[in-house]
Design a protein with these regions (language model features):
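Structural signature for extended repeat/solenoid scaffolds and their inter-repeat hinge/linker regions
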Residues: 1-202
Length: 202
């Protein structure tokens, strides 16, 4: 079986096609697939190490994380130094810095997506955010409890108009997906405001 032969004999993710084509009877597509699989496994391991030393802090950059990764036994004792050319200057086509930059872009994009998911999932933000956009002239009221001493009519619209952006953020502040952007509070608030503006009128 050609695929099994590749698994058993080709373990260098940067092996040249010329050195391996005799193993797969010239089937380049099969070889390329195997190479991508090997590189993917290495990158998955690197991602775990980057995440381990980043400790969920988006503001922690490569100047802090990369030295910690290079000193980590899990890195030193693996095939990763060879993969990124730290211990073997061969035909590698990447560096630890390049792999970190790609992962860093991914984690920021992922955190941003999760932030939006958090906003969509929050019933308080959704309900009051939509209500704030409703025409103030609409008579959308609910009757107060019969036992209320004032016996007044409580306007949902009036209540909604009193909620500012800080009130919305106070509900979100304990969510990990919100806290991860603590280093950019103004940008975070802008995202919340933009989301509220994007809501449709109920």
């Amino acid at each position: 079986d050609l695929r099994q032969r590749l698994v058993d004999t080709v373990r260098d993710p940067w092996m040249a096609w010329e050195d391996a084509k005799h193993l797969v009877d010239g089937r380049r597509a099969l070889f390329d697939e195997h190479m991508e699989h090997l590189r993917g496994k290495r990158r998955d391991l690197l991602a775990k190490l980057f995440a381990k030393h980043a400790q969920d802090a988006l503001q922690t950059g490569g100047d802090v994380i990369l030295p910690l990764v290079r000193a980590d036994p899990a890195y030193i004792e693996s095939a990763l130094p060879r993969f990124v050319g730290d211990t073997h200057q061969g035909q590698q086509h990447t560096t630890l810095e390049a792999e970190f930059d790609a992962w860093d872009q991914w984690r920021h994009a992922q955190a941003r997506r999760e932030f939006q998911d958090m906003l969509r999932e929050n019933a308080f933000v959704d309900f009051w955010g939509r209500l704030q956009k409703r025409d103030k002239g609409e008579a959308d009221t609910v009757e107060a409890d019969d036992e209320d001493d004032e016996g007044t009519m409580v306007s949902l619209l009036d209540m909604a108009s009193q909620l500012d952006i800080q009130a919305m953020e106070s509900v979100l502040k304990m969510d990990k997906r919100y806290k991860v952007f603590a280093h950019v509070p103004e940008q975070r608030t802008a995202w919340v405001r933009a989301y509220l503006q994007s809501l449709s009128v109920p």
